[in-house]
Structure formats: C-alpha cells, structure tokens
Amino acid sequence: MTPAWLDRAEYPFATRRVTIEGIGMSYVDDGEGPTVLMVHGTPSWSFLYRHLVRGLRDGYRCVAPDLPGFGLSDKPAGDAYRPEDQARRLTAFIDALGLKDFTLVVHDFGGPIGLAHAVDQPERVRNLVIFNTWMWSLEQSRQVAWLIRALSGRMGRLLYERLGFSVNVLWRQAVRDRRYTPAVHAQYAAALRAPAARHATWIYAREVLGSSAWLEALWQRRERIARLPALLVWGMKDPAFASALPRWRALFTDARVVEWPDVGHAPPEVRGPESAALVRRFLEEPRRTA
C-alpha cells in the first residue's frame, strides 16, 4: 500500500516487493536495457535516486531497493542492521532478481554494503559509480571514534529513535543546500516518522565502529575491484567524506573523477539531474556498457 505521505510528483515510480530473510523489501524496477543497481545509505532510501532513475530509465533498467529498516521496506525490531547483515541481504536481493553484469551505484553506507558484493563477486559488476562514502575502518579517526562512542549508548539511542537525530539533524547538516527544500526533507523524515522505524539508523551509527573488523577486512580485499571502471562523484563540502576522495582515487586504475566544491554529502539529491547526466555519459563512453 502506498503511504499517504508519499509525493507521487517527486517519486512517480511503481514499486515492487520481494521477501528477503523474511523481510519485505520494496524496490523500484523501471526501464529496460543494461541494469543499473542503486544502493542507498542512512537515513535515506530509494527516493535519493529518483533523479537518476528519471534520467536513465529510457535506456537502462534502473533497480533501486529500500534496504530493510528504511524507506518503504519492512522495519522489524532487533539489531540485525549491521552493514554485514545488509550486505548479505543485498546479495540475496540481487540473486532473487537474477541481476548480473550491472553497474553498481553507491552512496554513504550503501558504499560498504554494496561494494561488499562487488568485492565478493566482481565478475557480476560491470562498472562502479561511487558518491561520498567509505569502505574501511574509521577507528583511527579520533574525532569519529569519540562521536560514535558517545552516540552508541543509551543517550544516543534516545536521540536517534525518539528525536530522529539522523534524519532531522545529521542528514540536514551534511546536505546543507538551498535545493534541499522542506518538501523534499519531508519525504525522508516521513519514512522514519515513528520512533520504532528509526531503530536501524541508530544501529548504523553504532556500527561505524562496531563493524570495524568487517570494514577493515573489506578494505583489505579492495584490489578485487580496483580494475573495474569507476566514476567518482564527490561533494567536497561533505563534513563526513570529503577527505575520503584521494583514497578512492588511488585505488582505481580506470576512474573518472568529478568534484563539486559547493556540494555537501548527497550529490544525487541536490545535483540529481546533473548526476544522472554524468552517469549516462560515463556508461556511454566507448567499451562501457552497464
């Protein structure tokens, strides 16, 4: 059932559902052609990629799932929202839809979650499109470690679940753009309206450090994706991941890099049509098919 708060002018896509590990997952599957799989982070959902879907669906099959705990997907209670849990479910989702030879698009927590599949099965991925994200342990960052430890306790859980700290504070501050209107913000906030629906956002925050071993193991296998054609699109005003770009740039042997100095954490949101155009040009370069 479509929720009453959903703005169909902004998100006009038909959604489908599939059950993964007993959890109902909503996803967009629009267009025909080579497949482009788009994986969101926190506190976002497939709404983040609406501009990419609009800009690519006339020549590509655009698949954009809502990971469990987010968007229009089920949000069961419990702590099974670690990135490694979500990565396992994403692979099950990919298998359920029979996706192969696809372009993988990732952002934020969608980075390690989606790229884990690429690291495990690089032969199934044709290209990578990477927006502001990371794929390594952040334990050595004293500022990050201090903040996450402070947010991992009872007070942090209260902030995330009762006050919507992730979507109403951190996300807003990280995006910081006049194009991010109250009406657009309402689509992110409404998907996490109830305190119980915000639980996954707190688990994600906790696991920035809690999943450090998994993240570091993922980074140690990074050479498995180093030769994939990659497009790196970076908002350089991002307080979280602006500084991560050089590490990504050094990894890939075949990368196109676009830096937007006036953009924050979410280029697909605030530069949506431009992002779609960049992705299309990247995919249409000689020898590149999604």
Where are these regions (language model features)?
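Conserved HGGG/HGGXW glycine-rich cap/lid loop of the alpha/beta-hydrolase fold
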Residues: 28-72
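Conserved hydrolase catalytic core segment
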Residues: 100-139
